[in-house]
Swiss-Prot record:
Keyword line: Cytoplasm, Elongation factor, Protein biosynthesis
Family assignment from sequence similarity: Belongs to the elongation factor P family.
Species classification: Bacteria, Thermotogati, Thermotogota, Thermotogae, Thermotogales
Entry's Gene Ontology molecular function annotations: translation elongation factor activity
GO annotation (BP), single: peptide biosynthetic process
A Gene Ontology term for the protein's cellular component: cytoplasm
InterPro entries: Elong-fact-P_C (IPR015365), NA-bd_OB-fold (IPR012340), Rib_uL2_dom2 (IPR014722), Transl_elong_fac_P/YeiP (IPR020599), Transl_elong_KOW-like (IPR013185), Transl_elong_P/YeiP_cen (IPR001059), Transl_elong_P/YeiP_CS (IPR013852), Transl_elongation_fac_P (IPR011768)
Name of the molecule in the record: Elongation factor P
Amino acid sequence: MIDVGSLSKGMYIKYDGDIYRVVDVNKHFRARGSGLIRTKLKNLSSGLVREVNFNSGEKVEEAEVTFRKASYIYNDGEMYYFMDAETFEQYGIPETEIEDEKNYLVENTEVDLIMHDGKPIGIQLPTSVVLEVVETEPGFKGDTVSGGGKPAILETGLKITVPFFVEKGQKVRVDTRTGEYIERA
């Protein structure tokens, strides 16, 4: 059991019988009395995010999770399949459990499988991935005056904003935490 005051973003806890990843933590302290810890928790089995408030001093159970290196191999529309880098064993994860992460997966993407009781319950992406631009408008001379960028659709269907000089067919590096363009690859 850990004190809720020590919760931080990215931790895994057991709450109401399910495993959650801590997405956000805000600590509010009152003049008198105990503090309030507001958290956003993502349920790893359903993918839903819920807000939970704790009083300081409360305790929660830390989930026992392990990470295994794996690579994404394919999906069949319902399940996404990954191969363990050490044992070459294949694991399937339902699409609903990796709803946010699936837009960054192309064949052979290296990920960390989040394992609990020997079963995969989610994935952790690298901080950035390289994806190909499949659709964007051509840039025009003088476009840079307004700054900003233009919309682009990547090979996975992800929509991001890219600088005007990026063209269709080029590869770009995307931050998986924010979904933003980093650089041309």
